[in-house]
């Protein structure tokens, strides 16, 4: 019985601490977001992202990055294209918390770099600029992550 109670306390503690991770830790610790982690790290935006009070991240899964052509993928990672990389990374973040449960129909908002994003719900499925949210409402210390099936490319 003691072992059961200790195991229960450990599992409850790990659940409550999961929400205590910041956005950068949440990305780097998720094995399905390693490509996004690489982009965030190379963009040198880590400190900027930690400065926001609340954020929602529409996080492309590694498979979404794999769908990009090699030229596009490595083009963003080229040192000469840091501005483009930063624009791409920032395009996936929205200031504030956008919970899947609170979005009824269609809303337009701005990414943290000021570009428009259309978020809509169709038959209970959330989309952002046409990318499907395949897993929603992953909480971190000051916001929310929604995993998407496509990389959002700013215009």
What is each model feature region?
Residues 1-2, 109:
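Generic cytosolic/nucleocytoplasmic N-terminal low-complexity/intrinsically disordered segments
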Residues 2-3, 41:
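Bacterial Sec-dependent N-terminal signal peptides
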Residues 4-13:
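Sec-dependent N-terminal signal peptides
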Residues 16-155:
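Mature, structured domains of secreted/extracytosolic soluble proteins
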């Amino acid at each position: 019985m003691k072992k059961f109670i200790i195991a229960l306390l450990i599992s409850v503690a790990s659940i409550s601490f999961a929400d205590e991770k910041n956005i950068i830790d949440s990305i780097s610790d998720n094995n399905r977001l390693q490509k996004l982690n690489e982009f965030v790290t190379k963009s040198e935006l880590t400190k900027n992202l930690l400065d926001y009070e609340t954020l929602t991240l529409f996080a492309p899964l590694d498979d979404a990055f794999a769908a990009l052509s090699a030229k596009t993928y490595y083009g963003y990672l080229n040192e000469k294209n840091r501005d483009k990389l930063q624009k791409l990374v920032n395009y996936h973040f929205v200031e504030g918390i956008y919970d899947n449960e609170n979005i009824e129909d269609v809303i337009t908002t701005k990414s943290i770099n000021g570009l428009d994003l259309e978020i809509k719900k169709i038959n209970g499925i959330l989309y952002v600029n046409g990318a499907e949210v395949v897993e929603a409402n992953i909480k971190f210390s000051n916001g929310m992550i929604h995993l998407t099936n496509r990389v959002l490319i700013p215009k």
